[in-house]
């Protein structure tokens, strides 16, 4: 008798994705982050669902409802901090996942890569709107500053901002719609994840060597299920350590002050995972130029497949490209640090230099180095 997992219409899909899926035998732990992201999304949707049961999206009561969740709801504090720090874990996994894609040439599967970029934008939008919901000082002013950037769009900018706000400033209407979208978007993200996997399973996974691995495959279960479970346990250990010992480590103290439109915080900044893009935005004195640079800092990922000049797919056997890749990582860490600093000397010039470096490495140095390495292969 044939196994039910191979014949049942629903179980067959699960079987082909999680049990009998052929995986290259050489994939390393850097391939774990896809499943970690799925785990993060599950944690965020579950904790968010329970938080939404107690939260009120009204400017008069939003801050107090979050306080009520932390003080009066059974295990409300752990739900709130799991959700807030879960977002940080989400972005750590996301950035490592993208970095692995760049290092090992996974971007050559262009459909999977492009869906991934759409997913990144969706996750960033969700996280931004979530940051507004507690209605602290940084929530209000962060929302005001970031949404105001759209006013740089010629002709329609001002009208667009007022349309998003639902009035002439960030107020009750803005908070209500942000809550609605913050609740909706994770389910859209989950649907996009399915599409992401659909495209991935059309081509099969890449591997560290960059060499076709059709002749050397292992089944996903039990080898990679065990490996993924280990990764998920490690991530949950890190997350629970953060939540139980230092829940406010990555947050901003200003968000414990109720939102006050009459009092501007001395230094407005987003959550740490947006600081690199915020630093790029601030490094350009012109408003429209800054907004374009901000969008391009993420959209530049879309041109990476077009700039692949190397005869080898991965960077595994390309030491000069490896140095450039880690230089890019160091540059992003520098931008993250600069984004959290006040706008004054020497931070301004460091931010401008790091922003130029970011685009130069991706758009100029990496393709040029690939061509040089191709030439060296002929020796």
Swiss-Prot record:
The chain crosses the membrane at residues 33-53, 77-98, 113-133, 178-198, 226-246, 288-308, 320-340, 347-367. It is found in: Mitochondrion inner membrane. GO terms for cellular component: mitochondrial inner membrane; respiratory chain complex III. This is Cytochrome b. Heme b b566 binds at residues 97, 196. Its cofactor is heme b. The cytochrome bc1 complex contains 11 subunits: 3 respiratory subunits (MT-CYB, CYC1 and UQCRFS1), 2 core proteins (UQCRC1 and UQCRC2) and 6 low-molecular weight proteins (UQCRH/QCR6, UQCRB/QCR7, UQCRQ/QCR8, UQCR10/QCR9, UQCR11/QCR10 and a cleavage product of UQCRFS1). This cytochrome bc1 complex then forms a dimer. The keyword Lyase does not apply. Heme b b562 binds at residues 83, 182. The gene is MT-CYB. Keywords: Electron transport, Heme, Iron, Membrane, Metal-binding, Mitochondrion, Mitochondrion inner membrane, Respiratory chain, Transmembrane, Transmembrane helix, Transport, Ubiquinone. InterPro entries: Cyt_b/b6_C (IPR005798), Cyt_b/b6_C_sf (IPR036150), Cyt_b/b6_N (IPR005797), Cytb/b6-like_sf (IPR027387), Cytochrome_b (IPR030689), Cytochrome_b_C_euk/bac (IPR048260), Cytochrome_b_N_euk/bac (IPR048259), Di-haem_cyt_TM (IPR016174). Its main location: mitochondrion. Heme 1 (or BL or b562) is low-potential and absorbs at about 562 nm, and heme 2 (or BH or b566) is high-potential and absorbs at about 566 nm. A ubiquinone binds at residue 201. One of its GO terms (biological process) is mitochondrial electron transport, ubiquinol to cytochrome c. Binds 2 heme b groups non-covalently. It is a multi-pass membrane protein.
């Amino acid at each position: 008798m044939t196994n039910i997992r191979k014949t049942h219409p629903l179980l067959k899909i699960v079987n082909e994705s999680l049990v009998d899926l052929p995986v290259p035998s050489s994939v390393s732990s850097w391939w774990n982050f896809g499943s970690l992201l799925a785990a993060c999304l599950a944690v965020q949707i579950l904790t968010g669902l329970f938080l939404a049961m107690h939260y009120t999206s009204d400017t008069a009561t939003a801050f107090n409802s979050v306080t009520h969740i932390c003080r009066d709801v059974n295990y409300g504090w752990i739900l709130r901090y799991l959700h807030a720090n879960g977002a940080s874990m989400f972005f750590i996994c996301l950035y490592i996942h993208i970095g692995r894609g760049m290092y090992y040439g996974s971007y050559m599967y262009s459909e999977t890569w492009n869906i991934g970029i759409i997913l990144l934008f969706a996750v960033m939008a969700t996280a931004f709107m979530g940051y507004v919901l507690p209605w602290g000082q940084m929530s209000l002013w962060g929302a005001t500053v970031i949404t105001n950037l759209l006013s740089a769009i010629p002709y329609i900018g001002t009208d667009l901002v007022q349309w998003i706000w639902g009035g002439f400033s960030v107020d009750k209407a803005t908070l209500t719609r942000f809550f609605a979208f913050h609740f909706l978007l994770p389910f859209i993200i989950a649907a996009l994840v399915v599409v992401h996997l659909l495209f991935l399973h059309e081509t099969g996974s890449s591997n560290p060597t960059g060499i076709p691995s059709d002749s050397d495959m292992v089944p996903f279960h039990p080898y990679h299920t065990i490996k993924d479970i280990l990764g998920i346990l490690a991530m949950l250990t890190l997350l629970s350590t953060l939540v139980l010992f230092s829940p406010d480590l990555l947050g901003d103290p200003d968000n414990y002050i109720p939102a006050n439109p009459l009092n501007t915080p001395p230094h407005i900044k987003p959550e740490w995972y947006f600081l690199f893009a915020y630093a790029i935005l601030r490094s350009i004195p012109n408003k429209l130029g800054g907004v374009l640079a901000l969008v391009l800092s993420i959209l530049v990922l879309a041109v990476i497949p077009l700039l692949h000049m190397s005869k080898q797919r991965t960077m595994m056997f390309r030491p000069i490209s490896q140095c450039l890749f880690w230089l890019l990582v160091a540059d992003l860490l520098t931008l993250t640090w600069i984004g959290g600093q006040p706008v004054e000397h020497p931070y301004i010039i460091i931010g401008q230099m790091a922003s130029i470096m970011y685009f130069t490495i991706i758009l100029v140095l990496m393709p040029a180095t690939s061509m040089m390495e191709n030439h060296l292969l002929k020796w």
